[in-house]
Structures are given as structure tokens and as C-alpha cells.
From Swiss-Prot:
The keyword Transferase applies. GO terms for molecular function: protein-lysine N-methyltransferase activity. One of its GO terms (cellular component) is cytoplasm. S-adenosyl-L-methionine binds at T161, G182, D204, N247. It holds the Pfam family PrmA. Methylates ribosomal protein L11. This is Ribosomal protein L11 methyltransferase. Its EC number is 2.1.1.-. The keyword Ligase does not apply. The gene is prmA. Belongs to the methyltransferase superfamily. PrmA family. It catalyses: L-lysyl-[protein] + 3 S-adenosyl-L-methionine = N(6),N(6),N(6)-trimethyl-L-lysyl-[protein] + 3 S-adenosyl-L-homocysteine + 3 H(+). CDD domains: AdoMet_MTases (cd02440). It is found in: Cytoplasm. It comes from Halalkalibacterium halodurans (strain ATCC BAA-125 / DSM 18197 / FERM 7344 / JCM 9153 / C-125) (Bacillus halodurans).
Length: 313
């Protein structure tokens, strides 16, 4: 079988929205080549547990590669992808070079190409993310999240995911109810359950993401605590929860802050990331305007996570 490798040279800011577009278009895998991973300083506790090859990375910017089966619909799919990516400019997202290339690859080349980009990575004091095919022996007090990266993978875990997991690790004490808005692969829902949350609801508008998350939830044996379903943000969600975590675009976070306040218990915690540094204050302003108290702001590379409390106790 032949595959088409769709590659786009863009910016780190555009990585998550572009990857989402590629997933929704039916990509069988997404590779993220970010040269910042070569010089990433995780400190003593966190980091990639393998050696990266500098030859695999662009000199600047980020290269995103997605793989699609060659069929009669490919041309139409590519045009829809281009249109959706250009539409990100309406959200003030810097696309950088925005240079797109298409190359045909054979099945065996594709099978080898993507696995080299996904290795175990320690993302917090207690959690390490491991691809399903890797043999990895957990150390004492180390929790493993196994992921099948069939839908998305890169050279390491995205900074916003790392920030959210570290925030969950600090917030969850045991027995909390959690909502994960825009769950994607389900990694944050799984992390919340493994850290001790008793009830987790993962929400995503994308049907493919929901299926991927459900599979990863079963893989990690947290299906008793975690339910994943298709939903647009917090629309129609009833009841209140202890924690809401959302790793999505700043503009989207701003749009549903009021809904998050309504769904959070008094004194509940709202963890948000997916925020590029230059949009940090916009999100903070929206949170404060809606009655949240900013507890902490954490930065990693060009990204920000904000931990806020529902102020009306």
C-alpha cells in the first residue's frame, strides 16, 4: 500500500491546531519535528529517555508530517486541509513559512518512519508516558501511562500536556471528580484517574479523538473511573465537579470560561493550557472577569498553564 506524506513547515504556536486539523482529516499518524526538543532542559527529574538525532529536525520552525493512504479522495482531502490551516490566521495564529509538500512513501517506509519519533518520556515526578510497543520497567512510585500513538505522536510530549499533568499531580489528592475538555488522546483523563480521581469525564467534539481516547482508557485499565464521550466543550453538562482541565486554544478557553465556572464546585480548580505566552493575559483577564482567582501561572518554553480557583465559596 502506498501512503502520502503531507508535510508543513510552520511554527510551534501552530502545532496543536494544525495537528487537530490533520487528525480530523483522517491522518493515520502525525509526526512533529521540533528542533527545541534537541536542546530541551527538563532538569533532573523530567526528560526524554532516549537519544534524539539532529538530522531529523529542521534548523528552525517546526515540521509536521501526516500520513494519508493514497486513494481517489486524497486530492480533495489535501485541499480541505490547506483551507482549514489557512483559516487559523483568523485566530491570530502565526503559521510561519506555511510551506506544504507531498511525497509518496511505501508501507514499509511509513512503518519505520513514525516509530522512531515516539519513545518513553517522564513528564512529572510520578508519571512516565510510554508507547505500547516499548518495553519499559517502572521504577518505584512511578506511574506508567501507555499510549497507542496511532492518531498523534511526536518527538516527546507537548509542553502544554506536560504542564497540565504536573498541575493535576499537584491538585489531585484523591477522590476528586474531573472533567477533561478537549481530551484528544485521553492522556489527561488517564493521568487524573491514575493520580487518584474517582470520576473523570473526557469530552471531545472529534469522533476520531473520542474513539482513540476510549481505546487508551481501556489500555490503561482506568475504564471504571473514566468515561469519554463526544461533546462540544461543556454544552449540556449538568452537575458540578472538583476539577476541570482544558488543554486547548486560548480563544476557545476564553469562550467557555463562564460555563466552566457554572460546572465547577465552589473552590474548585480550573487548569488551562494550550496558551501561547503572548495570549496569557487575555486568558487571565477572562478568568478574573468571571470570578476566578488566579492561583498559579507556569511556563514551559513558549507555553503557559494557568491554575485558577472558583472564587465564590
Amino acid at each position: 500500500m502506498k501512503w502520502s506524506e503531507f508535510s508543513i513547515h510552520t511554527t510551534q504556536e501552530a502545532v496543536e491546531p494544525v495537528c487537530n486539523i490533520l487528525h480530523e482529516a483522517g491522518a493515520s499518524g502525525v509526526v512533529i519535528e521540533d528542533p527545541k526538543d534537541l536542546v530541551k532542559e527538563w532538569g533532573v527529574h523530567y526528560g526524554e529517555i532516549y537519544q534524539l538525532n539532529p538530522d531529523d529536525y529542521p534548523e528552525e520552525g517546526v515540521m509536521i508530517k501526516a500520513y494519508f493512504p493514497v486513494n481517489s479522495f486524497l486530492g480533495e482531502t489535501i485541499e480541505e486541509i490547506k483551507e482549514a490551516i489557512n483559516g487559523l490566521l483568523l485566530y491570530d495564529i502565526d503559521l510561519g513559512h506555511n510551506k506544504i509538500q507531498l511525497v509518496e512513501v511505501l508501507e514499509e517506509e511509513w512503518a519505520t518512519a513514525w516509530k522512531k519519533y515516539y519513545k518513553p518520556v517522564k513528564v512529572s515526578n510520578t508519571i512516565t508516558i510510554v508507547p505500547t510497543w516499548e518495553e519499559y520497567e517502572a521504577h518505584e512510585d512511578e506511574m506508567i501511562i501507555e499510549l497507542d500513538p496511532g492518531m498523534a505522536f511526536g518527538t516527546g510530549t507537548h509542553p502544554t500536556t506536560v504542564l497540565c499533568i504536573q498541575a493535576l499531580e499537584n491538585v489531585i489528592q484523591g477522590g476528586e471528580s474531573v472533567i477533561d475538555v478537549g481530551t484528544g488522546s485521553g492522556v489527561l483523563s488517564i493521568a487524573a484517574a491514575k493520580l487518584g480521581a474517582s470520576e473523570v469525564l473526557g469530552l471531545d467534539l472529534d469522533e476520531v479523538a473520542v474513539k482513540s481516547a476510549q481505546m487508551n482508557v481501556k489500555l490503561n485499565k482506568v475504564h471504571r473511573q473514566v468515561m469519554v464521550r463526544q461533546n462540544h466543550l461543556l454544552e449540556g453538562i449538568t452537575g458540578t465537579r472538583d476539577v476541570i482541565v482544558a488543554n486547548i486554544l486560548a480563544e476557545v478557553i476564553i469562550r467557555f470560561v463562564a460555563d466552566a465556572k457554572a460546572v465547577l464546585k465552589p473552590g474548585g480548580t480550573f487548569i488551562v493550557s494550550g496558551i501561547i505566552k503572548r495570549k496569557k493575559n487575555d486568558v487571565k483577564d477572562a478568568l478574573v472577569t468571571n470570578g476566578f482567582q488566579i492561583e498559579e501561572t507556569v511556563e514551559l518554553e513558549d507555553w503557559v498553564a494557568i491554575i485558577a480557583k472558583n472564587g465564590h465559596e
